[in-house]
Amino acid sequence: MAKKMLMMVYAAAMAVAVANPLPERVKGLATENIPWRSVGPGGGGWIQSILWSRHAKDRLFVGCDVGGFYVSENAGRHYEMRNRGLKHMYVETIAEHPSNPDILFLGTLGGIYKTTDRGQTWLEKRSGLPPISDSQHTIQISKFVFAPGNPDTLYAAVGQPRTRKGARGQIWRSDDCGETWRMVVKSGLDKNIDIYDLAVAADNPNRMLAATNKGLFRSDDAGETWAPSNDGLPSHLRTRHLAWSPSDPKVVYVTLMQVGGEKTWSAGVYRSEDGGRTWQPRSNGLKQLAGKPGSNDQLCTWTDCLAVDPRNPDVVWTGGASWWYTGVYGTTNGGQNWKRAFPDERPGWLKFWGPTVMCLSLSPADPSRLAFGTSGMVYTTEDGAVTWAQRYSEERTDGKIVGTGLDVTCLHSVTPSRHQRGKFYLGYYDIGLLVTDDDGRSLTRQMTGVPGKFSNSCFCVAEAPDDPQTVWAGFGSWGDGGSGCVAKSTDGGQTWLPCTNAASGWIDTHVRDLTVLGSKPNYHLLYASPKGLIESVDGGATWACVDLAEFPEAPRVRALAHDGGRLYAGVAGAKGEGGAVYGRDTAWRRLTPASLQIGQIKDVAVEGARILVTARNEYRDHTFRAGGAWFSTDAGATWRKVFSDKFCGAAVISGGELFVSLTDHPYHDHCVGGGVIHSRDDGATWTHLDGPGLQNWNASALAVDPFDRKSLWVGTGGNSVFVGRLP
């Protein structure tokens, strides 16, 4: 009996391990499961794929470029994130099993994933596919299609519709419902072909069409051999998406892309009435602007995604794909005439982006329902495009923003107020600064006064030590080479005034980090930048570069910290040296010896005499320098490496406990990060903080609530913020 019980416990433990596989980077650590809740505004990031379920009218699936996978059971009014088991969060395509509602497939930039429990857990399906790479994407999936009449057979096309940089000329086939795969193409598609879409005829599982960067290709032998099928299409052959009519297999539609600056407009929708052999233009009513010479593809007009009514081959929907041509367009006569079907007035809190359509789905269970995703929003109609609703956040009349589970945003920083319990400043990519004053239950976007050219991102926030209403923040565009500004608020962050006038000595550069000391009226500000450490001793009225005398070049300063009067700066390595930490009481001096060979510094945290510095792997000047975490207990007099990892990110010390985030870049097959690790013994041992409520391990920002040290805030690269409750 005891042996049987032991085996049951072991089996249960193994089931949990399989259901929630840990990243390789933390498999050697003990796991501490804690409760988590999500905080976010809803929307705000790229919606890359969307699909109405064929099995349940109210079920809607959404896939995003950094946020993974979401399910709504009430037609988009609320969502659940379901990312456990995914090792890549860019979901290009979603496929639902024709007869089993619990089986789904995700095509990501890093490969194929399958669930048998409707997304509660995912397993990677790699058998037969190329080996996993740590340096590149080996198989970027653009589309799945099931073979009609055989739900165990499905195809996976390889391509990258968004970047148009996924050319491999590959289509893979599985005959055991995705468990194993084989390359099916024998001829006709070369390695320079980027497959954007794939379709199969409803009445013939052997007949297929592929839309590619080099035109349409047709196969009549289940994908083994291919031939061009472009009769009637423009000569540029920039085909994009396909829609094969389920009710009339002779009817197929395809969209073509316009390239900015070409003299003649040659995009639009084309229709075939012979199964894709010949094509006729069907663009009457669609705007036809070629754009100015030298302009990019977003400054002309073209449509991209397609959906055809399963009952009527003449009822079709398409989505505007450029900045100048947004929203959804419909036809009821096979494309003879198109009309805009989406209103100019957009509901929801995201007003500063247009509804450029990135994905589109017509419900097979109820064709009066249409859903589309944009670079930040989801919209649906349930009455055939008569009325529309936003489906990414709650509709409020009090100016507050409350998400509904579809959080698709990335964080630069999480900054708790030192003065007001429950107030946090959240610095986002793309949407700027959002603030909560009720512990994350609602948010407000606080960007009034920030110049438009700096409004993309908020990188950092710092409150005055003695005044809760006085706040500074760093705004700007991505990247070290970007432009930026420091702005000041005297009303708790509601409005801002840039500290960047020409007479101030302001140095236009990216603002990586910011710290404030002193008291009214002469606050002491420092900000970290690629052009050095920039200082103001008069609250931002004037600025000057700080001389770090020991550093042989103009330092690229990456992080700042202070505890009391002492300042610390994490600095990128100069020629021949690794990263370094500097400290200042009365003068700056280097604290880390060159022998440490620290990689690219990401963060510095301090509490009393304890200093924690994190870094990622770096290869520079023909020398590899490792990432990890280094720790000092004596104000920088001595150091030891307490954790090794290729990409350590944010660092926090709270009540003597250490926290480090493990992140990653998104340019290889497995790139979900490693979550958060925690040490209670000065880095001698570490535990991995996990739990089913944490749906994103790509932790980019950390903070502990100063009013409640058991509350850990984790900003992520894709799913906004998670708040964990420490034991």
Protein language model regions, located:
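Extracellular glycan-interacting surfaces
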Residues: 2, 18-727
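Sec-dependent signal peptide recognition
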Residues: 3-11
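Hydrophobic h-region of N-terminal signal peptides that target proteins for export
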Residues: 10-19
